[in-house]
Structures are given as structure tokens and as C-alpha cells.
């Protein structure tokens, strides 16, 4: 009888813990069970004594704090690493959003689907259909990247005249004031034509003078600069990175010393600036330079603080001593990027963004704005590239034939095409959901790191798969190659705005664990509270909550793993239910493994970068699954799109599973590893990779026009015009599919099996035999010309490939000969 009541109590407490009931609820359940058990003769005085010994110290606040929490708090403070001011600023920057639900182990899927689907306004759609289409049609990407190594002057002027650099600037200052989602759509379309074009447009609309001025500038600064930035009269750049400070941007050696100097005929207090920056986009052509530097006040002209910290100022580039103009050459994607230097350049304090009172606030300003900008520009450029090369690879695979069949029917090619299709769907879902969060007022610092890392990595993977599909067509650079520049430039997005190797290993989980965990940040903050009683009370409340949270996740994880999450709640009972359930299971596993990792590694967890990376992978792939499911729901749960959803969810959940397994395998204790394997994977690993059959569906989807394929092509420049290779190829795909029945008709009537080339000769054969009409023969011959345009590559006169000094020398020799 006693054993039955004990087991019953364990079950009841487990149910309460699973549903995250309060301590008082658990206490009430325990007391009720003891009372009933006592009347039933199952419990006696000893049982009550044991219960009181445990319950009283935990329930009475004074006793608990003095004898339990106080020693734990003292030990916690000893092992907890101190946070620098820059780390605190980074952690405090931005807001938490859906990723916090995933991190806590109990995602509310109804809440996810209640977030509104982002939509364009009439004005934003008109801009995309008008100026964006126009500028795409103006640009010859080969001319820009190979011959000019810059945008043509007419394109630059068109961008300025149509306020492409003012998408983030408010209308009151002459800007467009577009939503984050609209900015993303614009950048996707520009990228689909030219990575050079989207890079130049993206940077001024991300972290830079315009964004910083709107949030922190004085009214005088806003009124002066923002209208000029909006009209294109000023070209901005922002200089942060130095030779000695790349990923560790807070360690910049550039400095400004507060001193007195002459300014416009008067002696004023100002700053003497010295800097050496590199990798600064738009620096060679900028008219105003946003500068990050460490501000020092050795003579105390502003107060008692000597080292004021990182500060941001606006410097006109026409000031004497400001060095700009020289260029870097980033992987044959020649957007304007270069170094800038200055030595002992005196400016007044009013040049600080926000005025003198914002001295030392630069790092906070930067990380707060980066949490938004990083969610838009690079992810959007990546998505635009992924979707474009997915469509182009699909059309090319259907047009190009080897061994008498389209190469897209070969299983090896299908494997690459399937990944391209899946990435195109899920990456677009992720950027739409994330920019939608920004438009809801969020500053999702963790989300922005997640999609920056994963979408740029997917872009890099996509270029590799596309290059494999295209073979020599992708290798030979020239006006007819739409892959080469993107392939060359893929590492650029990987590296900038937080190198991906740093983002994955340190930022995603390092920031996410503290920001998204419901109790860790409070526990850490308690260490810095000077009032001991207040600190103890704050820590006590957080720790007790943390313990309950961990127990709940332990119970949830065991139950969901043991049952295969079959009883987990889902918002829909259709074919997507499995993905919601598995995601809930892995969410609970993430929450539990986070607490276990913190307990095992303590303060050294921040240095266990590979452990941190795997925890970050878990969080990231759960976010990508969430975005995929939300997109499917937002677009009306169209059955014809389900194959894309299925592939994306299976792929991302498989990566979750692998990260979890690798995490377990790298725990330091063998007994712990064994216990975790038994707890998290009691019947083995449940998720399998997408099947060959499913990947065949996705590969075929990219090769045949359909409504699903059209949805994948959203905000891709597909206009059929001479300078748009991908748009022309899309038309060729339709034409090839249209004439295949004519080709088959000739083969059938002539009783021969011909290869699908020299279609002009096939057309003449059919015409001569009376099989085809003149119109049908003409159509077949026209398709042959278009087909050859698709598969042929460029060749050059050697002189056309000369560059730099060699080109200048050749030109001089020709001039001398003349």
C-alpha cells in the first residue's frame, strides 16, 4: 500500500512538474497525498517527519535563504566569471522573441501562428515593381564587375534619385521609411540580379550613420544629415573594424583625446582623433564617415572619468587629414570598400552622434542597432541568392541534356536540386518571420545572429551545389555566367557583421543562454547588487525558479522521449503534426541540456565553444523549423507545397538530433553520457534524413513551372530582357517544354530516336516530311537558338582579360603604335 501511494505521489508531482505548476501546488499535492495515505494506513509519523524535514526549510523563506541559498550564492559568485561592460552591453541589447519560447522547452505553437504575416504596403509594392525592376534592367553585371569594377555612373545616380539609400530613413526627413520586410524584398530582388548592386544598397540601410542618427542623433544632426542622406547628396559609411580589432570589435585601438583646439576661429573643447580602419564599405566614395573610437579625457576637461569608452562621431570626409579613396578588392565582387585613416584630426564635441552626453555610449548604440540590421541585410541578400540559383539550376537541369536525357533526371543531380529547393523555401520563411518580428517592434539580437549565420551558410552551400549541377557552365566566367560572381563572393557574407565561426561558437548560444533563459540573467545580475539582503532575495527567487524549471524540463524530456512525443499538443492534426511534436521534444531537450551544461562546466562554459556551438545549433534549427511551419500556415497550408515543408523540417530536425547526440558524446563523464543517452534517446534516434523519393519530388518541382515554383520565385528578378540571364533562361525552359511534343512527334513519325539537339535540323526534317507545319518548325528552330544560348559559355580575346597595370600598358602600347 505504501509503495502504491509513493508511486502515485511521484506520478502526481511529475504531472505537476510537466505542466510547470508552482511550488505551492506541488506542496499541496504532497500534503493531500500524505493525508489520504495516512487515513489509508499507508503513511505514519516517519513519513510526515521526512516530509517536514524537506518541506519546511524549502518553504520558509527566512530559513531557506539563510541556510541553503546563502552558501550557494557565495559559491556561485566565486565561480561566475565577471562580465565586461562590452559583454553587458551586448547581452542587454535588443529583445527576446520566439527564440525564448524555444529555449524554455515549452513552445506555444498557437502563439507562433498568431504573429501576423508580414505584408507590403501599396507604396512598397510599387517601389519593387517600379524602381527596383528598372535598376535591375539597367545593370550589366559583367560590365560592372569585370570592366568597371563599380556600378556605372547612371546606375549610381538612379539609386540616389530614387532614394534606394533611404529605405530606413523616416519620411519626415525625406526618406522612404519602409518596413523591414519591404527592405528585405527589395534586397532579395537586387541580389537576384547582382550581388554588387545589393551590397551597395544594403549597407547604408543597415548599421550606419542613418540608423544611428535616427535613434541617437541630436535634432540638429538629424535635420542636417538625414535629408541629405535621403536625397543621396551625402554618401555614408561607418568605420568600426581595425587591423588589430576584427571580430573583437570592442578592442579597437583607434582613439580620440579630449583637448582644446581651434575651430572656426575660436578655441573650443573637442577631440583629437587618430584612426586606422579597414574593410569599410563605401569608404572610398563616402562624403560622411561614421567613426567608432575609444574616447579619452586625460586632463579631465569633461569630468572625472578618464576613459570614457567607445564613442561614435560623424566626420566629413573632405576635412584635411581624412584619408579615403583607396580600395580593397573583395573576391571579384567590387563593391566600394576600402581603408580610411586619420591622424590628430580635431573636431568639436558636437560631432559626437547624440552630442557630448553620448560620449562613451558608442558600443551600446552599435549593438542595439546591429540586432536589427543583422536580421535584414545579409540574410535577405542570401535568400535572394539562394532562390535565384535554385530556379536557375532547376531550369538549366531541364534544358541541359547528357546521355539523351535532361541532367535533372539523374539522381546525383536530383540530390543537389532537392537541397536547393528546400533551402529556398526555409530560408525565405526564416527571413520573412524575422523581419516580421522587427516590424512588430522587436530588436531580436539572438534571432538576427541565428539567421545571419545559417542563411549565409545555406547560401554558401547552395552555390556549391549549383556549381556542381552546372559543371563547366558555372566555371567559365563571362557575360553568360550567372553563378560565378556569387560563388566567388560567398565568403564575404560569411565573414562580415560577425564572422560565422565566431557567431556559431560564441554568439548564438552565448547570448541566447543568458537572454532567453528565464532565470540565468537574474542570477547573474544578483551578483552585482551591492545590498546583500536584496541580492540574496533576488538570487533566492531566481534560483528556486531555476530549480523548478530544470525539474520540469527533466520530466518533460523524459516523457516526450519515452513516448516519442506522441501526446504532445499540436495546433494541427494533419501531416505537419509530427514536426510540431518532435520540435517540442527537442525544445525540452535543449532547455535541459542547457542547465546540465551550465552545471557541468560552470563558468568555463563560455570557453567551451564547441559545446556552446552545438547548443546554439539546437536553438537555431528549432527556429528554422518554426519559420517553415509558420510560412506553410501563413500561405494557406497548400498541399502542393507540403513536400518543401516536409524536406525542410526533416532536414532541420535531423540537424537538431545530430547536435544533441554530439553534445551528449562530448560530456566529460561516461556515466553522465550513458544516462543522457538513455534519457534523451531511449529507443534510438527518431529522425531520419529526407528520403530519395521526397528529394525526387523537390528536384522535379524546380524543373517544371507551377504555382509552387512561382511562390519560391517571389521577389526574384525574372523579367525576360537581354541583360537578365536567369530571366531569359526561365523563358527558354517554358519554350523547351512547349516544343518537346513536336520533337517527339518527328521522332515517332520518322521511326528514329534522335538526341535533343540540332533542333533546327529536326525542324527541317519534320517540315520536309510534312510532319510539322511551318509555324511548328519555326518554333522548334527558335528554341534551338535559345537552348544554345543557355548551354554555351564565353570566350575572349586575350587582350580583353588584361586588368590593372597590364591593361594600361597594353593601351599605352597601342597608343604609341598609332
Per-region residue spans from a language model:
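Amphipathic, small/basic residue-rich leader segments at the start of a protein or domain
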Residues: 5-15, 26-36, 47-204, 211, ...
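Conserved phosphate/anionic-ligand binding catalytic regions in large, soluble enzymes, centered on
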Residues: 173-175, 382, 386, 465-478, ...
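A short core secondary-structure module
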Residues: 266-322
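Flexible, small-/acidic-enriched active-site or ligand-binding loops
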Residues: 320-346
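A glycine-rich, basic-preceded beta-loop-alpha segment at the flavin cofactor/substrate interface
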Residues: 339-374, 391-408, 554-575, 586-606
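Loop-to-helix element that buttresses phosphate recognition and phosphoryl-transfer chemistry
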Residues: 412-439, 467, 620-631
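Charged, glycine-rich active-site and insertion segments that engage polyanionic ligands
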Residues: 442-474, 643-656
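C-terminal amphipathic alpha-helical interaction region
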Residues: 545-818
